[in-house]
Amino acid sequence: MGIRAIVVDTAGTTTDLNFIEDILFPYSAKVLPAFLEENQKNVLVENCICDVQDIALEPDADLARVTEILLQWIEEDRKATPLKTIQGLIWKQGYANGEFKGHIFPDFIEALDGYKQQGLRVYSFSSGSVDAQKLLFGNSDAGDLTDKFNGHFDTRTGNKRFKQAYCNILNTISLSPKQILFVSDVLEELKAASEAGLNVLQMVRQDNQRTGDFKQISSFAEIEL
């Protein structure tokens, strides 16, 4: 295939969706009110609060209202950058306190070593912040995997369901589309990446998963490069 880099989605691809939905999201919702109260004067958190007010079109929203908005966004799985930034900060505390370990599928852990031996570059692209991705892979149940990655992309690169995000990745890593393989479980993301010219594979890890016309795999062990 002439592949020189692999870009992977996280939730549902490298990481069990249940870990995200049943552990990380509820933890961020539980901790959020106290976290905002304690850190509202932190510059990064303060900027996120302002961004929430802007996105919600509520410039005068007080901290209680901002908290309410963010909790609603968590419930809706909203891919808003300020939410993802705050969640990343909350999860950092959780990992540091030993509340949980990042779940990574064993087949991806094994594949990472093979990619490095082949001289392939590996990137992750998630709606979760870059910091949250580093925490996930740096505090995984298999140890620290961060040195096996060449970089990470998040919503600042673009919406994963739009072609432009993948064009932005191409510009950043300076490779042609056909030199990149994108692996995700989400059809809309695969469609957008395909429109940008990337090679794509759909990861199917659940029996009830939506599938389309893209080539499917159920494990990274099935990828032949």
UniProtKB/Swiss-Prot annotation:
Q: Name one GO biological process term.
A: L-methionine salvage from methylthioadenosine
Required co-factor(s) are: Mg(2+)
State the signal peptide span: none
Q: In which pathway does it act?
A: Amino-acid biosynthesis; L-methionine biosynthesis via salvage pathway; L-methionine from S-methyl-5-thio-alpha-D-ribose 1-phosphate: step 3/6; Amino-acid biosynthesis; L-methionine biosynthesis via salvage pathway; L-methionine from S-methyl-5-thio-alpha-D-ribose 1-phosphate: step 4/6
The family database entries (CDD domains) matched by this protein are listed as: HAD_EP
Q: What is its EC number?
A: 3.1.3.77
Disulfide bonds, paired cysteine numbers: none
Q: Which UniProt keywords apply?
A: Amino-acid biosynthesis, Hydrolase, Magnesium, Metal-binding, Methionine biosynthesis
Q: Which domain of life is it from?
A: Bacteria
Name any one Pfam family assigned in the record: Hydrolase
User: What does the record give under GO molecular function?
Assistant: 2,3-diketo-5-methylthiopentyl-1-phosphate enolase activity; 2-hydroxy-3-keto-5-methylthiopentenyl-1-phosphate phosphatase activity; acireductone synthase activity; magnesium ion binding
Give the co-factor note.
Binds 1 Mg(2+) ion per subunit.
Give the catalysed reaction(s), semicolon-separated. Answer: 5-methylsulfanyl-2,3-dioxopentyl phosphate + H2O = 1,2-dihydroxy-5-(methylsulfanyl)pent-1-en-3-one + phosphate
Keyword ATP-binding in annotation: no
Q: Which family does it belong to?
A: Belongs to the HAD-like hydrolase superfamily. MasA/MtnC family.
This molecule's function is given as: Bifunctional enzyme that catalyzes the enolization of 2,3-diketo-5-methylthiopentyl-1-phosphate (DK-MTP-1-P) into the intermediate 2-hydroxy-3-keto-5-methylthiopentenyl-1-phosphate (HK-MTPenyl-1-P), which is then dephosphorylated to form the acireductone 1,2-dihydroxy-3-keto-5-methylthiopentene (DHK-MTPene).
What's the subunit arrangement here? Monomer.
Its recorded name reads Enolase-phosphatase E1
Q: Which gene encodes it?
A: mtnC
